[in-house]
């Protein structure tokens, strides 16, 4: 039924109810009409229906109905972006629900209010709206947990929780609370899947995909969006599916795959949009994408023969990318344009224009240093043009200002710009330059601002006698701009004009690339890289899976994320499909591709709660010890899943989880009787990569693809549900990520099967036909063991391993073992004729079926094509046995038709001389050592034992991580013996697990030398001396050595696993952000570390973020008690990282953040995160924030969040932003007067305090009896009056101060005797340092000095202390 038919039907029913006076019925039809209209984007009409519904229900005094009507009116107003009116109606809904004590409606009211505040945040980015939204959602969730449990069905409760978790996840994502965000989304998706809530599942997956996209995690984003798209299809909601396609196109654009992005946008266009502006957005995005594709194709054609045209196209591409906000691609295009212009020797002025484009684009990318470089190049190319020089110098000054350069570097640029503008007599430009210079001087050099202001006034009074330069003409529209919609292949008739069904549309997604090369039919993929088998496994179509496998579909292909069909079947819980795939040889322990984080099918099943599937995998031999890249075993994955969802699990599921946990524990400890894997009836060729399994048919068509290199991709701005952002206007961020791009095809609507760059290159080969001759009757024998070994090595490389796997193995308990028969013909039996054909592609169409057996005909595809020569002719290389030794020397044949002779007797090769064949390709073995995976080639020319592989893996790990492990290797849980030959136990592309049994840890000095040697870094003598003298000490110090990152790396690697280390001091070096990961790796191996000093190490926000992210979930900083990050340029933006760091160090008692570049903006961006972190730091005793120009407001925010009951020492030296910042003492007094304040030591030196401030401070001393030490030094406006005030206030306390510092204050002598008496009574230590002290003061101290006290009296210093 169409929309118009439904509307007519409901309108008739509404009219009938109106005639009959049935007001409630009429209101119900109004409600239904409003919902239907709103679902199709007609919000204004829907609003009128709900308003009519409200009037009708008010007339019959239906309070609950009125409440619901207010909710619907509020929702419609919110959709029309009238948020104030929407909130008014929603609060009326809340009040009415409260008056009825209806907890269900109260829950919905709070949830609706929260969603509206979330929409307000999306509209105006107000943080206050976010906090209100979070509070509303939490109230709603509390009602569900506390009031509605037991009142509603489990499904209704799950539905409420699903939506609340989703909304809380969105709120936490905007608040940058990543961990909470991920947990909420996981809970929402889990509940939606369990209860088949497809609309909520769609929203959760869609939003999670958008979050992954914004975070640059394209693989995860594509998988989430595909899941959302499946939900939209299941609900037959075309608009929702259209939104998914739009977001998929954005992801693909970021990856540089504009052909695939075009296909996704065309699908979105055909599906339609709920809002008219969304359809306009899709059209604009499609125009942009098509323009890019057109220009890229023109550029590819022009690069070969028309460099001038290519240069123009590069400029058009750069302009197009710039307008779209894709600045990295724009910069790349302009850079290419510049390169071509230099090759063509274009004029200087033309080169200067390109440099301007590059500089502007780099400025948009916030890379102001490089922008300055290009402006300087423009300046060099435009000598003599005063006006252009003025503009360029002005741009240089602005870029340097953005880069944060000092005033001394900015001022000359402004001055040169102003002088050039004067020469060009451009008064308006002069005013602009002086105005900006004036603004800069107010911030950086206030004393010079007055002169600039005077010059500005003089300039504004002067009359401009010349006409100002006209505005630059607007850029003409690109010649290659996309044509109108009708020309852009947007027509509904292009791909589905014949009324194709949904199934045909899905088949269109899986069409192969119709390019120049013939492509394997099984390698057809959709935009996600999914094959037909992937789709069948996702949709649970067992019959389809069976048909595909029987027809020869590969079993283990990967999609673009890296998932195999078995992964998908396990993820969706299709037990019978999993069973079928395992029966036919699917890889049970496949860890997935690069985007899968090492998740095996068992991990996937457990992470989705499919316990029957997990049980089947374990029975079929799945490893229970393999870990993901995050270090999680299957058992830990299950425990994490139970912990996350425990509250939402029913009793049966909890019991199943407990049973599975016991099963995994028994299996991992070796107590479970593990079922042997079923015999693989269709085994994979061991020379295949795991990305594509061999087909089950004997002679499959080979697949091929062309990989593209990775390039820089931008991370886009935020996109929310039901609100897509045009590709022409979204801002970008610069990131480097692997991209996937489609290869060219004749029909661009067909997805390409050869897109993802992570796939490995494959070549198609055909195995040569082998003819086995009849045994000869007689022959001379001259056999040697060396000859047979050479043959065996050669034939092993040809593909005999595949045949061995196909032959059934003997039972282990068999007593009668038949004599082994060699697959080779002994030299004494073979014929001298040419019995082995050349292994080149054959031209004949077929072979007799009786020539060889089936398994001998099965192809073996090596990775690299190897041309094999005939064994009985000298077409390639032959070997000669030198007299006196048995070595083989290979030489090229001089005449391929004449047999070569060797040896002194010149015997013909037919008499028994061996041949040296071309070396077979090496076996590749993947070795997993903890979180590192190494691919190690094993040459087959010499049979290597497993011990050799172990040594190679250990050396590679040492080269990468700096630690030399002692390893044992396991394959599928079986221990590999060191003496076994590698080809006998492993096949190419097998993955083995290396278990670290111990570490090779020589003395610290030797470890440092070994690390320097492996890194090619020279030894630093002072570090070597420190290593020698501190090797057995629990403390290691390498301070003030100015070690650069290259010199610090071997030092940090040498300290790995130095478990005795408790204190590490690296102050005064150049660690920087780049070395943070190396430091983290070392900290992760020193669990007993309690002190870490990283002060003055050039550590910035990025380095701190890396330390925090790497230490999350690990024990790297768990025992740390003292951390010094002073004198590092952390800046105001480090708030989130600092909060995470505090949470990662639960035992931290001392934190020093002196001179870290904090300003008045500190705490503004991440106040909630930092506040919560400080409040949770229950062990924090000492905090230093000195020498950060916080100012009074920022200091107040800081002190509000500090734990008053536990903090003992607080250093706030020199935190006043300026001399006029007189309110610095007020937040300190508020903190001291807090209930339970435990502060004992307070430092307020160098804060421009005066007598008034000290007077206010002294009044609060009786309220803070814990304070025993006060440092007010370096405050020159503090006089004797302040000292008297302090002493008087101390008399009101039960005890005085143990320390009072007044050095650098204006204490003038002589002090009267009463004052000295108070000093000796109330103070145990006093420091005075002022030139105004007199000799009488010194005499008074000597006369009144109590026993056990000492003094220091020298020049202007007067210190005393009671011992």
Curated annotation (Swiss-Prot):
Disordered, as annotated region = 460-511, 662-786, 841-866, 883-909
Q: What GO biological process terms are annotated to this protein in UniProt?
A: double-strand break repair via homologous recombination; replication fork processing
Q: Where is the composition biased (Pro residues)?
A: 692-713
Record keywords: Plastid included?
no
What is an example of a GO molecular function annotated in this UniProt entry?
histone binding
Residue positions, PTM Omega-N-methylarginine = 796
| First and last residues of every ANK repeat | 528-557, 561-590, 597-626
Task: Establish whether keyword Transmembrane helix is in the entry.
Answer: no
The task this protein performs is described as:
Component of the MMS22L-TONSL complex, a complex that promotes homologous recombination-mediated repair of double-strand breaks (DSBs) at stalled or collapsed replication forks. The MMS22L-TONSL complex is required to maintain genome integrity during DNA replication. It mediates the assembly of RAD51 filaments on single-stranded DNA (ssDNA): the MMS22L-TONSL complex is recruited to DSBs following histone replacement by histone chaperones and eviction of the replication protein A complex (RPA/RP-A) from DSBs.
Protein name in UniProt: Tonsoku-like protein
Q: Which species is listed as the source? A: Mus musculus
Give the gene that encodes this protein. Tonsl
């Amino acid at each position: 039924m169409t929309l118009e038919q439904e509307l007519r039907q409901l309108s008739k029913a509404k009219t009938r109810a109106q005639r009959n006076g049935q007001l409630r019925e009429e209101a119900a039809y109004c409600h239904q009409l409003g919902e239907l209209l709103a679902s199709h984007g007609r919000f204004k009409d829907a609003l009128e229906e709900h308003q009519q519904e409200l009037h009708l229900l008010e007339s019959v005094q239906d309070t609950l109905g009125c409440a619901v009507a207010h909710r619907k009116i509020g929702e419609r107003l919110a959709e029309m972006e009238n948020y104030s009116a929407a909130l008014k109606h929603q609060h009326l809904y809340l009040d009415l629900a409260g008056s009825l004590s209806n907890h269900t409606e109260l829950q919905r009211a709070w949830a609706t209010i929260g969603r509206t505040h979330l929409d307000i945040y999306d509209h105006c980015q107000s943080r206050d709206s976010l906090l209100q939204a979070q509070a509303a959602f939490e109230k709603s969730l509390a009602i569900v947990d506390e009031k509605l449990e037991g009142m509603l069905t489990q499904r209704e409760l799950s539905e409420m929780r699903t939506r609340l978790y989703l909304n809380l996840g969105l709120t936490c994502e905007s608040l940058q609370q990543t961990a909470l965000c991920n947990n909420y989304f996981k809970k929402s998706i889990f509940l939606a899947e369990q209860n088949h809530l497809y609309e909520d599942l769609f929203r959760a997956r869609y939003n999670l995909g958008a979050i992954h996209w914004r975070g640059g995690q394209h693989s995860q984003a594509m998988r989430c969006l595909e899941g959302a798209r499946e939900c939209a299809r299941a609900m037959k909601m075309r608009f929702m599916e259209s939104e998914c396609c739009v977001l998929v196109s954005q992801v693909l654009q970021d990856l540089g795959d504009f052909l695939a992005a075009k296909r996704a946008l065309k699908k979105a266009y055909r599906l339609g949009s709920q809002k008219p502006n969304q359809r306009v957005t899709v059209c604009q995005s499609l125009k942009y994408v098509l323009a890019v594709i057109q220009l890229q194709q023109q550029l590819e054609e022009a690069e070969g023969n028309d460099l001038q045209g290519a240069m123009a196209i590069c400029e058009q591409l750069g302009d197009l990318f710039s307008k779209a906000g894709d600045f990295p691609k724009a910069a790349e295009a302009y850079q290419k344009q510049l390169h071509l212009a230099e090759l063509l020797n274009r004029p200087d002025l033309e080169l200067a224009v390109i440099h301007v484009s590059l500089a502007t684009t780099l400025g948009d990318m916030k890379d102001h240093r490089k922008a300055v470089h290009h402006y300087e190049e423009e300046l060099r190319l435009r000598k003599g043009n005063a006006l252009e020089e003025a503009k360029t110098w002005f741009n240089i000054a602005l870029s340097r200002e953005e880069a944060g350069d000092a005033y001394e570097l900015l001022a000359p640029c402004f001055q040169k710009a102003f002088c050039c503008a004067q020469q060009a007599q451009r008064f308006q430009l002069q005013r602009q330059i002086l105005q900006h210079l004036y603004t800069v001087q107010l911030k950086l050099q206030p004393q010079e601002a007055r002169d600039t202001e005077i010059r500005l006034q003089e300039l504004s009074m002067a009359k401009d006698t010349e006409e100002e330069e006209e505005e630059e003409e607007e850029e003409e529209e690109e010649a290659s701009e996309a044509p109108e919609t009708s020309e852009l292949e947007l027509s509904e008739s292009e791909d589905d004009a014949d009324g194709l069904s949904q199934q045909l549309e899905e088949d269109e997604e899986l069409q192969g690339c119709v390019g120049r090369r013939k492509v394997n039919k099984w390698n057809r993929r959709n935009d996600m890289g999914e094959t037909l088998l992937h789709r069948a496994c996702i949709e649970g179509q067992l019959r389809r899976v069976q048909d595909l496998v029987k027809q020869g579909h590969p079993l283990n292909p990967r999609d673009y994320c890296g998932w195999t069909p078995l992964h998908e079947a396990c993820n969706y819980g299709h037990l019978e499909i999993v069973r079928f795939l395992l029966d036919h040889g699917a890889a049970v322990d496949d860890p997935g591709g690069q985007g899968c984080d090492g998740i095996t099918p068992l991990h996937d099943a457990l992470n989705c709660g499919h316990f029957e599937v997990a049980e089947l995998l374990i029975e079929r031999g799945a490893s229970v010890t393999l870990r993901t890249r995050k270090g999680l075993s299957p058992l830990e994955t299950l425990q994490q899943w139970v912990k996350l969802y425990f509250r939402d699990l029913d009793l049966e599921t909890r019991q199943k989880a407990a049973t599975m946990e016991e099963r995994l524990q028994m299996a991992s400890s070796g107590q479970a009787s593990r079922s042997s894997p079923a015999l693989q009836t269709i085994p994979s060729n061991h020379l295949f990569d795991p990305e594509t399994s061999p087909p089950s048919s004997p002679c499959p068509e080979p697949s091929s693809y062309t990989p593209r290199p990775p390039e820089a991709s931008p991370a886009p701005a935020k996109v929310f549900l039901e609100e897509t952002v045009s590709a022409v206007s979204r801002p970008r961020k610069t990131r480097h990520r692997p991209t996937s791009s489609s290869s060219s095809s004749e029909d661009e609507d067909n997805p390409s099967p050869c897109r993802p760059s992570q796939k490995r290159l494959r070549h198609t080969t055909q195995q040569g036909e082998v003819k086995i001759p009849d045994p000869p009757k007689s022959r001379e024998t001259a056999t040697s063991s060396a000859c047979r070994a050479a043959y065996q090595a050669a034939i092993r490389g040809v593909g005999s391993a595949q045949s061995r796997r196909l032959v059934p193995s003997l039972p282990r308990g068999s007593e009668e073992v038949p004599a082994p028969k060699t697959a080779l013909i002994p030299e004494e039996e073979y014929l001298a004729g040419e019995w082995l054909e050349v292994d080149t592609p054959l031209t004949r169409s077929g072979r007799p079926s009786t020539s060889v057996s089936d398994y001998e005909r099965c192809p073996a595809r090596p990775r690299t094509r190897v041309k094999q020569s005939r064994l009985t002719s000298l077409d390639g290389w032959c070997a000669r046995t030198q007299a006196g030794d048995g070595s083989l020397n290979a030489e090229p044949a001089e005449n391929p038709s004449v047999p070569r002779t060797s040896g002194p007797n010149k015997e013909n090769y037919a008499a028994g001389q061996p041949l040296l064949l071309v070396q077979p390709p090496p076996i590749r073995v993947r070795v997993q050592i903890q979180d590192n995976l190494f691919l190690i080639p094993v040459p087959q020319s010499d049979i290597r034992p497993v011990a050799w592989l172990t040594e190679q893996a250990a050396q590679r790990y040492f080269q990468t991580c700096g630690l030399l492990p002692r390893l044992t290797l396991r394959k599928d849980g079986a221990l590999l013996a060191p003496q076994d030959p590698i080809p006998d136990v492993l096949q190419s592309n097998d993955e083995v697990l290396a278990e670290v049994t111990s570490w090779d840890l020589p003395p610290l000095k030797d470890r440092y030398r070994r690390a320097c040697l492996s890194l090619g870094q020279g030894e630093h003598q002072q570090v070597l001396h420190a290593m020698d003298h501190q090797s057995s000490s629990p403390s290691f110090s390498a301070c003030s050595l100015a070690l650069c990152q290259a010199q610090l790396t071997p030092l940090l690697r040498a300290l790995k696993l130095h478990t005795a280390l408790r204190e590490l001091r690296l102050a005064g070096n150049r660690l920087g952000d780049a070395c943070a990961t190396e430091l983290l790796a070392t900290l992760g191996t020193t669990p007993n570390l309690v002190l870490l000093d990283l002060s003055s190490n050039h550590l910035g926000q990025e380095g701190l973020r890396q330390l925090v992210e790497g230490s999350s979930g690990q024990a790297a900083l768990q025992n740390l008690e003292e951390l010094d990050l002073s004198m590092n340029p952390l800046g105001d933006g480090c708030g989130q990282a600092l909060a995470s760091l505090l949470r990662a160090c639960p035992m931290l008692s001392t934190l020093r953040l002196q001179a870290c570049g904090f300003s008045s903006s500190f705490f503004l961006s991440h106040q909630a995160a930092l506040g919560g972190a400080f409040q949770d730091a229950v062990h924090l005793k000492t905090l230093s924030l000195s020498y950060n120009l916080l100012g009074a407001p920022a200091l107040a925010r800081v002190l509000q969040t500090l734990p008053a009951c536990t903090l003992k020492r607080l250093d706030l030296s020199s935190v006043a932003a300026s001399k006029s910042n007189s309110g610095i003492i007020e937040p300190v007094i508020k903190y001291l007067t807090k209930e339970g304040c435990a502060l004992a030591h307070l430092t307020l030196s160098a804060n421009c305090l005066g007598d008034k401030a000290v007077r206010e401070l002294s009044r609060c001393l009786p309220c803070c009896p814990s304070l025993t030490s006060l440092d007010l030094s370096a405050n020159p406006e503090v006089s004797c009056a302040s000292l008297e005030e302090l002493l008087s206030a101390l008399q009101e306390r039960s005890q005085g101060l143990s320390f009072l510092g007044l050095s650098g204050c204006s204490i003038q002598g002589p002090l009267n005797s009463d004052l000295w008496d108070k000093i000796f009574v109330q103070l145990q230590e006093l420091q005075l340092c002022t030139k105004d002290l007199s000799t009488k003061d010194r005499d008074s101290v000597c006369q009144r000095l109590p026993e056990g006290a000492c003094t220091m009296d020298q020049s202007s210093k007067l210190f005393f202390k009671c011992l």
